Amino acid sequence: MPDFILTIDSDEEVDVSDSEQLQDINPDFKFQIDGETTNTLEEFDFQENKVKEVDLDEIIKKKGGLKEESDDEELALDGFGMGASKQEEEEEEEEEEVEVPEVKEVVEPEDSAEAIADFYEESSPQQTHTSFQTLQLSRPVLKGIAELKFTKPTPIQSASIPIALLGKDIVAGAQTGSGKTGAYMIPIIERLLYKPSTSTKVIILTPTRELALQVYEFGKKLSHHVNNLNIGLAVGGLNLRQQEEQLKTRPDIVIATPGRLIDHIRNSPSFSVQDIQVLVIDEADRMLEEGFQDELTEILSLIPKHKRQTLLFSATMNTRIQDLIQLSLQKPVRIMIDPPKSVASKLLQQFVRIRKRDQLKPALLYQLLKGVSSRVVVFVARKETAHRLRIVLGLLGLKVSELHGALTQEQRLQNVKNFKSLEVPVLICTDLAARGLDIPKIELVINYDMPKTFEIYLHRVGRTARAGRDGTSITFVGESSQERAIVKSAIVNGKGVAKTVDWKQAEETNKLLESKESVIDEVLEEEKEAKELLRAEMELTKASNLIKHEQEIHSRPKRTWFKGEVMEQLTKHGKKVNSKKRKANEVRKDEGRSYKKTKTDRMKISNKKKSKK
């Protein structure tokens, strides 16, 4: 993790792969409420030198927020304010706009029946297992399964485990929360029971640190009764030296993100992948996208192909055969578990028609959250919105956490932990940050901003009304045809009602918010100053360490780094490029300059012509 303080410098949450289909990238990332899911993570340091964080709650308290008051109405009447004015928000949006040349969408042809038959192994009827005992697993593995409170295999586990135990390659797709992690981890641990523990045998690749941490946690619990089986973790954001020491022990299984794995292969002398027998790619759809293409190619070139079993798992495995060929799969078995096309039967969908009252949304959200003690997830479109709402609601006395890409790794995990323990009952998050987030016992989901597609809507509201429990979703609906179409699909596929709202009360609350806009600006400014002070302290400490330990630093072997094409595109003059600018750069690279030449451009061309003469 770099030594700098993360800031919220752009409205949109940007994904490295820049995928427009968010429903296709949902990591099997579960935080189990009923278990102690963060205990094993305490063995890791999040950084070699701890980065201090700004205590935003303390700033909010100084401004009069987060008071332990019994009467929420008194807090509301105290009149704490909303954030930037509408004009300022529009100016921020304009800064994000970049003229992008129009690109025609290329529709990839679907794989033919002949190509599918030639590439995949011919499917044969499989036994449906209703018990883990019928899978003929060993006693230590069954004990681990029992401690995880698994009673019977899920459809993806029933279909995948027997095939994986045979050593065959697998291409599998199943929705988030279907048990994909168990589908590959159970057969891996079962197979390792009978192999000597002399070197690393299994690599599990995940696209995100959170998913890697969750898989690591799951594997540790599942293998609790297995003797002499070690699991290692190699992800960014955790102590590099500590990971190197762990990899020196040659753990049987290494769970890693692509970049950090390449780093260790290149720079950790005691770590080798020459004996790898199983390669698992979790969220394979996303890993095969352009954002991870270079890293994946590098890893595949380093891991021996012979006698390697490859297991691909994803929420929606719709990758074309042409993209799978590079993985050197040997007649893989294709397993697809269809996701539901409707909401849970016990979910009550409520819709609030906003019309042209967008300015009342913060006040309306406050009304809905007053007095809430159960877990509530609020979805927003932008990380800036999540941060601002956290401050506003905090000033009004509500305990709220945020989850988005501008937070550090430690902040994200701590916020989720606080949410799980009900220390903070409300979590405001973006779709990208909450990919695959599966926390049981969520009673209410609020769509503050409407999702882009019905599939994303299903993923959002699917976080409540799980395991036969009742649940409620409340969605703020605008006037666009796209939003109306999503509501229509939701009602057709489940029960939905219009929610009655006291608009008069919302307007009164909004007036109080508008009258105190300066308060939120003061909080944001104080937070910014505190971050700048921390950054200066860190730079001073870094410079001091460079002088103090100069000899030791120069004596270390130089590390080599891998930087693919996408990382080159992501940075320009040391600054992050947002998604719109990146798209424009990609088009210009492919098609040449398609924008108007500037005065500087014309002068360069003129000088070139003169030099030729």
Curated annotation (Swiss-Prot):
Reactions catalysed according to its record: ATP + H2O = ADP + phosphate + H(+)
Compartment(s): Nucleus, Nucleolus
Biased amino acid composition, Acidic residues: 9-18, 88-100
Motif DEAD box location, chain numbering: 282-285
One GO cellular component term noted in the UniProt record for this chain: nucleolus
Function in brief: ATP-binding RNA helicase involved in ribosome assembly.
Protein name: ATP-dependent RNA helicase DRS1
Species this protein is from: Candida albicans (strain SC5314 / ATCC MYA-2876)
